[in-house]
Amino acid sequence: QCTGNGHITRSIDMINELRKYVHVDVLTSGSHSEVKLPFDVKFKQKGLSYFFGKNGSIDVLRTIRDNNPLRFLQEIKEVPTHLYDMVISDFEPVTAWSAKRNWVYSVALSNQAALLDADVPKPNIISPISQLIINNFCPANKHYGLFYQKLNSKLYYPPVRDVIKKLKPTDGSHYVVYLPFYSTEKILKHLQTFENTQWLVFSKHATQSYSNGNVHVEPIDE
């Protein structure tokens, strides 16, 4: 699911590990991820996806404008999931619904799947629309959640890429910020009020590296 970068970065090492044991073909849908997969993608679909806004929420108008339900239904029919023994989906709706349509066993392996688990803490007030999406966006025969606490046997820690594990971190004098739902300008305006603090911002909306006062900005590219 190319709505954001998390789905893509999680998939890289998982796919490489799976390929040690079985044949794996890759399908992506959506087009709002800056991180690129380091291997061939067999199927590239539009799917259904939301778009990041710049004021702390989803860009609703663009999400409505750029999604086409009829195209989505056609993609479900065209993706040949019937040729596969299993479908694994990280909150990717085309393969999930195609597998259901073709009676192919499917596994949901995602952060969103964790939200279906009774042991995962929930907010006191849950939007009915949000709950409807979580429950029905990507149907599956089995759900395994990626969560930051090992609360039961169906929850797993999110995978960390090998390239990240091999880095040698240092204790710098700055704080790291990643807020993809906000514009770079809005983040800068807020952080620059803390004049004696250094900030490193990774931004979905930046196209090059630059510094502005006590804030250094880096684009997302890997």
Where are these regions (language model features)?
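Conserved nucleotide-sugar donor-binding subdomain of glycosyltransferases
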Residues: S57-M86, P93-V94
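Donor-nucleotide binding loops and adjacent catalytic segments primarily
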Residues: I15-E17, Y157, R161-I164, K168-E222
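Short internal beta-strands
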Residues: V24-S31, L146, W199-K204
